[in-house]
Amino acid sequence: KKIEIVFFDVDFAKFKNFFFINRIKKVKKVMVTYDDYAVHEMNAITANSCDIILCQCPLSTLKYREKGYESYWMPPENDANIFKNYNLNKEIDVLFFGQLRNDRKKFIDFLIDNGIKVKIVGHDSNWVTEEELIKLISKSKIVLNFSKSLGETVTNYAAADIYKFHYQLKGRLIQSGLCGTLCISEYSPGQEMIFNEKEIPMFRTQDECLEIVNRYLSN
């Protein structure tokens, strides 16, 4: 069967570069990037060998369009057949799923110390299946999202370790909405492009996070 379209997931895979992809002929070539914030300089070169660029972040989409590429925003968590509202009783006050690295734990500990009940899954051995996670989201009043990148620094090909972190658009925002649950999120410019404050309440500090959580739990 003739192959017409080839997708290349290029992040942190140096061999899938401009020279490798450029040798592939007579197909439509699509570059896919999820962590473009860390490797944009290299990806922007690789993109020159592709026909279309798909980005997890709308900011990256604009960066590629600025360079003349045909680029589109493609959030990977947008399948409503997978992430759906089970209409379960909202018995969990606040849910966080993911790794408790960097200052995430400080934020959550601050909430707990101030009387907020937080359920945590997905850290260390506390894993759940995708179906279990979706049902947990459905039965939660609030999902908590953090936007900072997880590494100690953002290491990319041009800037080395100059930046301590980037604010990323995370999938929890979309997953939560599809499951019928409010997501309260740390600030990121990507989500600011898509959602307003009423759709995704945003915080920058621990005190702001606590105030927003209390406000919505009381309503």
Model-assigned labels for residue ranges:
Residues 1, 58, 66-68, 127-219:
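Catalytic binding pocket for nucleotide-activated donors in carbohydrate/polymer assembly enzymes
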Residues 77-142, 148-158, 163:
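Conserved catalytic-core segment of nucleotide-activated headgroup transferases in glycan assembly
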Residues 28, 52, 70, 93, ...:
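Proline-centered loop/turn at the N-terminus of a beta-strand
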Residues 11-14, 35-39, 59-61, 77-81, ...:
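Short, solvent-exposed loop/turn segments at secondary-structure junctions
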Residues 1-68, 81-83:
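Extended catalytic core of nucleotide-activated donor transferases of GT-like folds
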Residues 32, 95-97, 121, 179, ...:
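Short hydrophobic segments within beta-strands
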